[in-house]
Amino acid sequence: MGSDWDEIKRLAADFQKAQLTSTLQKLSERNCVEIVTLLLEKQMLEVVFTNDGKEYITPDHLEREIQDELYVNGGRANLVEVSKTLNVDLSRIEVLAERIAAENPSVHLVLGQLIDEDYISHIAQEINEKLVQRGEISISELASQFDLPSDFLQHDVVEKHLGKIIKGRQDASNPRVFFTQAYIQRCKAKIRGALAAITRPINVAVILQQIGVQEKIFHSLLDEIAPAGQVTSKQANSQYVPHIYAKTQADWVNSFYKQNSFLEYDAIQKLGISDAKSYIRKQFPNEEFLFLKRVALGARLVELTVVTALNECSATKQYLDLTTILPSNLSEEDIEEVFSTIMAQKHSNPSNFVYLDGIVFSQPYLAQLVQPCQALAESQAKAAIDGGVYQQYIVEKTLAQKGNVSTQELEDDGKVDKRDERRKKASSGKAGGGAQGRETKTKSTKKHQRGKAAAQFDSDDEDDVQQGTRGGGGASKKAVKPLELVKTADIVKLITASLEEEGLEHLSKPIAALYTNQFNQTALARAQELFEATPQTNRRQTHAAIQDRINTLLIDIRLYEKGLKLFPQDTQTQLVKYLLKSLGNEICNELSLYVASECNLTVKNTNLNVDQRNKLAQECEAQYRAALLEQNKALNKSIDEFELATETVLKTCSMIIKKVDKKKDRLLIADHKRKLQKQLLECHEPALLLHLAALILFTTITGSILHASGKFVSAILQHIRGSLNEEQNALLLRYHDLVLQVLQATPDSNESKLANEHLQAMQTQVVELAQNFSRASVSKAD
């Protein structure tokens, strides 16, 4: 038994010895390559080959070597450099680096670099040292220094260690800037010291350049410092204005205004104030100023000196030198602007003064100064007549006017001739009709009280000639140059002596220029009077007067025709007959007498009847005879036929038919109504009063005028009855009945006396109704 146990121990020792004994057999390199290749093929082994392929290493061992390189390089290793050092492909290094960064939170992979926490702590210490030295630092500077991304530096380095390794604080307005409290205190001290030393406005950029403080820090700390001044803005060109300077400005402006009562914009701008007007308003809120282009005048200066002096100048009928009462600093332009502004504000009547080179003349003074020029105008007018100068001027103007008329006739030939239409209408035998389409050219007014004015030489002829020359096809005609009888030099000679006594002779030409046209017109008017007084002009005056008279009567007939068309046909026919027997007969008489004068026939009675005119026409020359006879016949026909016959007579007499200006119809009707109202106020005869009242009411209600005799009063009252209320109709009807009663009764009878008393009592009511009735009343009654 014991021997067996010993045998077992011996065998165990041999076995242990066999186990502990290693084989000393060595494999060749070829065998090793084959073994490794076999293991790789069977995916039993993973290795990483070097770039030259001579060596290979396991990924785990390569990972340990990368970590060793990170440690050797101080916690920051560039993967490109690691790839070169380990002689391994960069892609393999990058894969393992990503795994290292993912597995180890203390290691970061940043832009192809491995960085561990030790390195981050190291650069945090460097940043802290730099922050202590400079007081302020930005992430952009650190990114440039450490060649690391700004986001990584801000979040993983600075903000992570802020308050621990890095002793500072983050700028609230700019998170990428960090500074120390000591730096802020230094900046405050610099800003406070710089601003305290400034006594005049200075650009903020200059201040920052001198003290070396950033602009954003300057503006953020300015309110905390509470400086003795203010910054104009936060823009790049802002300025700092100390309170002492603003006070100095205000004191200077107040002192200057107190002494002079005005302020110059240039002087204020030299103080550094850009908007002078706004500054003046702000500095003197309770003062009123007259703001001119160059200066601002105090309202007290204007009121107490200039306005008062102008009023005195007007009262004394003298002149005023404004330079003697205004500050000497003001230029001539300033003084003229002061005067113009005062006149615009209606402190005085502008028409009472004339301003010339700082001198204000009252109109009475100038009127007295140029009084001798009246005699000059008279003498020049006589000289123009005696020398034939004015007569030549009249001839040239007349020729120019005739040329203009010819041009108008040529233009009218191209238009539709409405007179042909009127001839067709007249041939149909209809009574009534109008003057539409008739060629007219007149400033027509009511028939009454216009004959005398029409006989005068038309002062508008010259203007008509010029307008016609400019406006139509008469381009070859030239306007007559105005005749200059009184010249500026003539007036200068007369007024220079008086002005020399006042030392104002340098203003003689400007004053003369003001009155040259006035006295020239006076001389022309006087020459016209002298010219019209000469025998050779009588014939021309007669022709012009007759022409205007006939045109005026034709316009009256046209307007009356519109009114009578509002009546029934039977009444209308009677009104047409009355119109032709009155105004038509007057036209026939005027033309017959004119033709008789042209034919050198003597007519004793100027109020001709139809037979007398026919007899006179037979004695006239052949060119007039047929036209006059036809016109006489037309008196018993329609208005259109009479107008056509009248136009024929006018053409044979070389008279112009003026065009219709319907725009003036309303004015003519209003003028006619005013004349009727004036006659009504002066009338005391009941029948005539009723007649006038009826015509006025008809014009007011219809907007047309009517030529009717007293026998048509009842028809007129019947026509306007619908536009009046019951009380008004009753008044007119009662008055009409009383008038008939008076006319039918014996003048001395009791019936006539009683009717007259009633008429006298009702007269005021009838007059008031006619005078005060309006279109508004018409609408209300309707």
UniProtKB/Swiss-Prot annotation:
Keyword NADP: no
InterPro entries reported for this sequence: Ufl1, Ufl1-like_C, Ufl1_dom, Ufl1_N
Keywords for this protein: Transferase, Ubl conjugation pathway
Uppermost EC category: transferase
Location of region: Disordered: 405-478
GO CC terms in record: endoplasmic reticulum membrane
Enzyme Commission number(s): 2.3.2.-
One Gene Ontology term from the biological process aspect of the record: regulation of proteasomal ubiquitin-dependent protein catabolic process
One example GO MF annotation: UFM1 ligase activity
Record keyword Acetylation present: no
Pfam family membership, one: UFL1_C
Superkingdom per UniProt: Eukaryota
Function as written in the Swiss-Prot or TrEMBL entry: E3 UFM1-protein ligase that mediates ufmylation of target proteins.
Family (UniProt): Belongs to the UFL1 family.
Protein name stated in the entry: E3 UFM1-protein ligase 1 homolog
Species of provenance: Drosophila simulans
The organism's taxonomic lineage, starting at the top: Eukaryota, Metazoa, Ecdysozoa, Arthropoda, Hexapoda
